[in-house]
Each structure stands twice: as structure tokens, then as C-alpha cells.
């Protein structure tokens, strides 16, 4: 699927080589069939940044297509009901281009989890600002939020009194 996405985006393998700077990275390709998803190298070397960026774009596009397909089925059997999916917008970034997704949902929503440390309030404000942009200043919803322990963090910190609204 990544090969097809690259072919649609770049049209020629030479355009891929140019965009990814494969001459510098000694990764020149002669055919779209030579394109593979990025792999962990494990020796401390960096992976090709152009390829990584395009793989993130591909991943976002593929997941958005799946969301649209599911949304369209739901719209056909539940007309008039608003549909959305949870975004995970944070300062940590994401593989998904949520700004591109914003127009596909009936309302924008976010999941946000308590981040231990001094930057917690800054991170919450940053994520909220991003959500304002994605929603084009329309109201947006907070779908999930942790007020205490989660099962996926090795150490959980309690929220300071008054910090959870």
C-alpha cells in the first residue's frame, strides 16, 4: 500500500529519489517495488527523514480513508447522527495529520491524559490551542481525560489539588 501511495504522490521513481534525497543516503531506487516501509536500524544510524515523513503521511491518509469508509456506512444506517473519532492531540505529536482529518468529522474531539511534571499545564494549553485550530474555532469536545493512574504508564503521579477541571 505504501508503494501505491508513493506512486500516486510522486508519479515517477526519480521524483521519489529526489524528494527523499536517496543519493545522499545511498538508497537510490530503480522501481516502486523497491520501496519498503521504514525499518528500525538499531545501530544508532538515522533512517531517511524524507521517507519517515512520507510514511507518516501515508499512515494518516490510510487511517483517514478507513475512518471515512466506516463513517459512510454508519451515516447510511443512522442518518442525521453526528459522527466523530477520538483524536490524540498533544505536544508529543502524532503520526496523524489531524488538521487534515478535521473536515471529515462532524465535531472534533480529543483525548488528553495527565502528564507528570512541570510542563503539564503548558502541554494542556498547547493541545487545546491545536484543537482550536483543527476545529476552526468551533466548539470541540474532550472525550477522554485521566485524573489519576493509567495502566500504560510505569509510574503514575496524582494530579495536584485544583489542577483537574
PLM feature segments, named:
Residues 67, 161-164:
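Generic non-transmembrane alpha-helix signal with a bias for helix starts/N-cap capping motifs
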Residues 1-107, 111-124:
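Polysaccharide-binding and catalytic clefts of secreted carbohydrate-active enzymes
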Residues 71-72, 128-129, 165:
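Active-site phosphate/pyrophosphate- and oxyanion-stabilizing loops and adjacent acidic/basic residues
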Residues 36-56, 112, 127-162:
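Active-site clefts of carbohydrate-active enzymes
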